[in-house]
């Protein structure tokens, strides 16, 4: 089969039967005689969009088995197709047409999955409805044939033959590292992911992620490419460095989109895509625009205008977010399912305000100006010295700009060791990550005035995540050592080595007595920070933590 013409399969009329899977009850009609329509080749449902795209879905298991655009089949590698997880297995698959829309419905246990095509479009719209944990559904993967979009991006390991870690982090001969984890992007940073080349662009436009988990700053794999082929992902629930429980319900649409080499149309992006044409298709869990509401805030006071602010909504059923306007903090978050949500205001990625808001169908909940108490922002506290900024990220620290798209062993990384002198480019000199087996025991040198040295002070260390319960214990001038702090709740998976510092922000506080300080104002005080834990292994997989900020309060 090549392109949308000259097909060997014949068109057939679809008649709804009593055993049709969920989602087809609202569909009826006969396939059009024109190019747009569907057919059955005995093993697959074949859909011609009437544009330049023809695709096939297995009647047995719901896999996407062929994806032909302008005569080239892009789908599959290594004998594997495109599907939920690694394939659902035997499923009930049905098809129907309603006017200019064709819907394929896949039922597997409690899970429902849908493919929709619209006449004249080079797009496939997908939805996935997770009812519970009985069917594993962490992702949809679009597998792409090898050699079609060759590249050497951070998430492509085609040219990286040496395994560095866990069979998913690799090194090139020049010492640069590559991994499917190294997208370098938070969910809120991207609308689409894919490749372009040879006058063709192939993309997945993400959904609004309302049923995913982790919030706006979550980082996960988005795509990969190896010598075998490539993969584009829609994340349904990813456990890597995850901070939230799994949500259930219908997620979508996410869109497989072909272009002539450019980016996909912004009309497909989350927050802009309208799907009123899907309202009557009968998909399980579907809620149209009329059944959703909006939250609008007139402003946010108490902000530090040097930082971006994000407003998040979350409850066990759904999550949403939106950016606050830089000038006044105005925000508007639409397409929200009815319910009561925790509203969180983030300075950068640091939560500085929480409240509650209730959303109703077809309604707008308008909030008066949200006032962030000064004490909620640790950056407002008066400090003798401060390393980094209190923004919930390691930004500005040594190697921080590299670690979302490279392994710590990457040749481009500056040395992870080395001591720090306050007043001498201290933030850029301090490593963004500390590990028990790599750079534990880092020393920070600083001076105090006589008056400052005569008083006790609070030392704070903010972290953004930890691996294997790594947490900081401090010693001052080899005369005073803090207790070992209890480990805060953090994800249990790898994080620091696979492109993510995003766990649970936590601040450790240490009350340092006056007797610990040097009495000579001309001498340096020495702070030693050790990473302690009874877990972890060695090297970059020893217990570790990511730094947000360190300061000594006045």
Q: Which sequence ranges carry the predicted segments?
A:
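Extended, loop-rich substrate-binding clefts of extracytoplasmic carbohydrate-active enzymes
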Residues: 77-129, 139-141
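Beta-strand-rich ligand-recognition modules
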Residues: 439, 445-454, 462-554
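Structured interaction patches on ligand/partner-binding surfaces of diverse proteins
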Residues: 349-368, 372-375
């Amino acid at each position: 089969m090549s392109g949308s013409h000259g097909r060997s399969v014949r068109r057939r009329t679809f008649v709804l039967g009593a055993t049709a899977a969920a989602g087809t009850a609202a569909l009826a009609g006969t396939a059009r005689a024109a190019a747009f329509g569907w057919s059955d080749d005995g093993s697959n449902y074949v859909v011609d969009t009437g544009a330049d795209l023809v695709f096939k879905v297995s009647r047995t298991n719901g896999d996407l088995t062929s994806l032909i655009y302008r005569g080239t089949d892009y789908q599959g590698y290594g004998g594997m197709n495109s599907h939920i997880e690694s394939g659902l297995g035997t499923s009930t698959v049905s098809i129907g047409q309603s006017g200019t829309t064709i819907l394929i419905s896949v039922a597997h246990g409690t899970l429902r999955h849908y493919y929709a095509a619209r006449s004249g479009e080079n797009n496939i719209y997908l939805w996935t409805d997770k009812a519970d944990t009985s069917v594993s559904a962490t992702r949809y993967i679009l597998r792409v044939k090898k050699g079609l979009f060759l590249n050497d991006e951070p998430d492509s390991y085609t040219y990286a033959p040496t395994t560095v870690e866990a069979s998913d982090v690799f090194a090139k001969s020049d010492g640069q590292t590559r991994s499917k984890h190294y997208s370098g992007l938070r969910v809120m940073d991207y609308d689409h992911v894919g490749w372009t080349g040879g006058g063709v662009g192939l993309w997945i436009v993400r959904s609004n992620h309302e049923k995913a988990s982790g919030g706006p700053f979550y980082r996960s794999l988005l795509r990969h490419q190896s010598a075998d082929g490539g993969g584009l992902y829609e994340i349904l629930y990813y456990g890597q460095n995850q901070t939230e429980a799994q949500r259930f319900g219908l997620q979508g649409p996410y869109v497989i989109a072909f272009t002539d080499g450019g980016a996909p149309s912004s009309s497909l992006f989350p927050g802009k895509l309208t799907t009123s044409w899907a309202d009557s298709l009968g998909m399980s869990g579907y809620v149209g625009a009329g059944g959703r509401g909006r939250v609008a805030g007139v402003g946010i006071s108490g902000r530090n205008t040097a930082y971006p602010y994000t407003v998040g909504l979350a409850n066990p059923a759904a999550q949403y977010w939106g950016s606050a306007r830089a000038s006044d903090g105005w925000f508007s978050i639409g397409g929200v399912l009815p319910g009561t949500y925790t509203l969180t205001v983030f300075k950068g990625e640091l939560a500085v305000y929480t409240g509650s808001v209730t959303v109703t169908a077809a309604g707008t909940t308008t909030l008066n100006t949200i006032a962030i108490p000064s004490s909620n922002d640790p950056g407002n506290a008066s400090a003798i010295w401060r390393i980094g900024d209190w923004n919930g990220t390691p930004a500005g620290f040594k190697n921080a700009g590299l670690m979302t798209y490279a392994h710590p062993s990457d040749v481009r990384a500056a040395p992870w060791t080395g001591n720090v002198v306050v007043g001498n480019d201290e933030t850029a000199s301090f490593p963004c990550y500390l590990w028990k087996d790599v750079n534990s025991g880092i020393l920070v040198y600083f001076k105090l005035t006589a008056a400052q040295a005569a008083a006790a002070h609070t030392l704070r260390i903010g972290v953004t995540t930890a691996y294997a319960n790594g947490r900081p214990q401090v010693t001052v001038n080899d005369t005073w050592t803090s207790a070992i702090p209890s480990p805060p709740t953090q994800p249990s998976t790898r994080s620091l080595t696979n492109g993510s510092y995003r766990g649970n922000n936590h601040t450790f506080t240490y009350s340092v007595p006056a007797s610990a300080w040097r009495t000579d104002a001309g001498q340096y005080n020495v702070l030693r920070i050790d990473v302690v834990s009874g877990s972890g292994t060695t090297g970059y997989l020893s217990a570790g933590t990511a730094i947000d900020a360190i300061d000594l309060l006045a």
